[in-house]
Amino acid sequence: MNKIHALLTASFLAIALAGCSSFSGPASPGALSAGLSARMDQPNATLDSQQAIGLINAYRATRNMPPLVADAGLNGTAQALASQYAQTGTAPTKPQALVQMKLSAGYPTFAETFSGWRNNAADAVGLVAPASKAGIAVAYNPTSSYGIYWVLVLGN
């Protein structure tokens, strides 16, 4: 049963990540969901944190790691750190209570941000850190160097 679950999860992840390509035609089967491909580089954009954590969980499943649960407190921490990052342009320091913190800047969508993390060896290891809860946030500052700043925090 575990092999079937892993195969299904890997298939879902492959389909989801296929949507990270630059294809700009009409929606097709397997296209990335709007919540993952919505541009965050505009005022009042709203991140679908459940879908974002779902994509991270699909990746974790391919590495035999348990899923993360979205946590309101960690979302608040992530938002405070993302806002600080967007205002100062300086990467925030990981609070000691966190298991892991991943940062990114400049990517307009979560799909692109996730692909950047997944394709960087150190960030990919961080995505599968032994944690049980997650918070994710994005902040937009059009006058800053990168415009958009992402923070993922993992905890227990």
Report each predicted region and the residues it spans.
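C-terminal motif of bacterial Sec signal peptides marking the signal peptidase cleavage site
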Residues: 16-19
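Functional surface patches built around histidine and acidic residues
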Residues: 2-3, 21-156
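Sec-dependent signal peptide recognition
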Residues: 3-10
